[in-house]
A protein has these predicted regions:
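Flexible, glycine/small-residue-enriched loop-and-beta-strand segment within the central core
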Residues: 43-44, 48, 53-150, 179
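C-terminal segments of enzyme domains that contribute to small-molecule binding surfaces
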Residues: 2-11, 113-148, 180-221
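Acidic, glycine-centered active-site loop in nucleotide-sugar glycosyltransferases
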Residues: 172, 177-180
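Short-chain dehydrogenase/reductase
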Residues: 141, 159, 175-176
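A generic "structured core" feature
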Residues: 99, 137, 155, 159-161, ...
């Protein structure tokens, strides 16, 4: 764990927990297994499960990332407020240019500007509001340049098409697209979805996953 300490890794190094180079860490950063972090700025209360891969991204706030999830930059940012959370499940894929932000400017006052922070020396939270935590469940794929807004829950197995703006909850195994994003279709039939949900494969340990190669490589409808 990196606790309230600022580190800039100038050269590649490897420990039992993390492979890292050219990163900046600040805050309470916890690694629960091996991960690969490259060219990132990571600040706040952030936890990584095993085998997380993050490249060229910015993370700030209260964020948890499940095992085997990957986040790719450049220009990818995941941000929460001091009181909010972003929770990302296991086996998720987040592409370049994705913006995930748990809070917004307050716009029902005289100015939407951060006037409290920048003029009256108040904490940033004075100028922000949230519709709630952002929850991204297991096996979600978020395409390039998507925006995920405050209070959204993206359910297991969903796919978010590139360039979408997600302003409301996404149903399990849905494919959604657009601004604002709307459901295009389901990935699979209800029978297949029931089979996958019953299997709970995202909870399997790595040895069981490897023993069931055909389960994962099989095309489904």
């Amino acid at each position: 764990m990196i606790n309230n300490f600022f580190i800039c890794f100038k050269l590649f190094f490897e420990t039992g927990r993390v492979k890292s180079f050219f990163n900046i860490f600040r805050g309470k950063i916890k690694f629960y297994g091996k991960s690969i972090i490259q060219e990132c700025k990571i600040c706040g209360n952030i936890s990584f499960s095993e085998n997380v891969k993050i490249n060229n991204s910015f993370l700030s706030g209260n964020i948890s990332i499940g095992r085997f999830s990957s986040i790719n930059g450049p220009n990818t940012s995941i941000i929460s407020s001091e009181s909010g959370n972003v929770k990302i499940g296991s086996f998720c894929s987040i592409a370049r240019g994705v913006q995930i932000q748990e809070f917004n400017h307050k716009f029902n006052r005289t100015s939407s500007y951060y006037i409290g922070q920048n003029i009256f020396n108040k904490p940033r939270i004075f100028d922000t509001e949230s519709k709630g935590d952002i929850i991204i469940e297991d096996d979600v794929w978020i395409g390039a340049n998507c925006i995920i807004l405050s209070g959204v829950k993206i359910s297991r197995g969903a796919i978010i098409a590139a360039g979408s703006v997600v302003i409301k909850d996404v149903a399990p195994y849905s494919i959604i697209a657009g601004v604002p994003a709307k459901q295009i279709k389901k990935r699979f039939s209800e029978k297949t979805i029931e089979l996958l949900e019953k299997s709970k494969w995202w909870t399997w340990d790595i040895s069981k996953i490897k023993e069931n190669e055909q389960f994962f490589l099989k095309e489904r409808s």
